[in-house]
């Protein structure tokens, strides 16, 4: 049976939540992270205005100030973000009980069995997007696909406030031209190895010799080759969404990073 998997990503999550509480900062460059008064720590999230100046997640606060002198830093309030994350999960729960959080601001949803009552995946994604704006005041980017890997790629494809399909009859056209580093689980080290093999795009990876990939990357080579070709049967794992894990740097990391 063909599956319908969504991946929902809350856009600039921490900054978006903060702007709900600081409407006077809308349209101005804003970043959340570290200790703004001491200028210690790193950027956890920047809003899209700050990103246009070159501010990036993981950048030291002093570096962000250099590239964007008018930026406003706000200290992180994890309890607040967790509350919004749980409210997002409550919205998702209206469409499926098969939900797998990916960090605090992203989730996979298996809506295969929801079509009869809720409509197809694209319609469900539209409803979720609309409700997130209306009920929580934030936007999401949603990928709609037949597996988790391409659903995630779909949510990354266009931001903010977008819905992108990656169906079986279109993923080659949409995904294969993207940089291979856009594929989930291709980190910096793996990307460098693939680059040394002449693999630049997801399409290059899909058309590569699987045996050679295994020789260079071990078991992960075969896994990534399968992902690039649309072979991903991994299930959406049923997680306890009432106790979401915070997977970003700890408060201590934020205060000691330079």
Task: List PLM regions with ranges.
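DNA-contacting surface of Y-family translesion DNA polymerases
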Residues: 182, 190-248, 252
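Catalytic palm subdomain of template-directed nucleic-acid polymerases
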Residues: 109-125
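Short Gly/Ser/Thr- and Asp/Glu-enriched loop/turn motifs at secondary-structure junctions
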Residues: 102-106, 145-148, 241
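Short acidic, glycine/serine/threonine-rich loops at helix termini
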Residues: 17-19, 42-45, 150-158, 218, ...
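Long, highly charged, low-complexity intrinsically disordered interaction regions
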Residues: 120-124, 128-177
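Residues that scaffold, gate, or flank divalent-cation-dependent active/transport sites
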Residues: 1-104, 108, 115, 228
């Amino acid at each position: 049976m063909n599956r319908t998997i969504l991946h929902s990503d809350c856009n600039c999550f921490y900054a978006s939540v903060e702007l709900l509480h600081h409407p006077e900062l809308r349209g101005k460059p804003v970043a959340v992270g570290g200790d703004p008064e001491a200028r210690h720590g790193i950027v956890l999230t920047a809003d899209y205005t700050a990103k246009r100046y070159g501010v990036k997640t993981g950048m030291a606060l002093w570096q962000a100030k250099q590239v964007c002198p008018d930026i406003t830093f706000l200290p992180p309030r994890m309890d607040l973000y967790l509350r919004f994350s749980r409210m997002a999960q409550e919205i998702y729960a209206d469409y499926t009980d098969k939900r797998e959080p990916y960090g605090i601001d992203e989730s996979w949803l298996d809506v295969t069995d929801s079509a009869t009552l809720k409509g197809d995946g694209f319609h469900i994604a539209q409803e979720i997007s609309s409700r997130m704006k209306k009920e929580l005041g934030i936007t999401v980017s949603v990928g709609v696909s037949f597996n988790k890997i391409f659903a995630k790629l779909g949510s990354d494809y266009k931001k903010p406030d977008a819905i992108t399909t990656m169906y079986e009859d279109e993923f080659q056209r949409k995904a294969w031209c993207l940089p291979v580093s856009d594929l989930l689980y291709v980190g910096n080290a793996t990307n460098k190895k693939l680059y040394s093999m002449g693999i630049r795009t997801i399409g290059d990876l899909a058309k590569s010799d699987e045996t050679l990939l295994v020789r260079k990357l071990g078991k992960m080579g075969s896994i990534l080759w399968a992902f690039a070709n649309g072979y991903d049967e991994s299930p959406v794992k049923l997680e306890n969404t009432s106790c979401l894990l915070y997977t970003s740097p700890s408060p201590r990391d934020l205060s000691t990073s330079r």
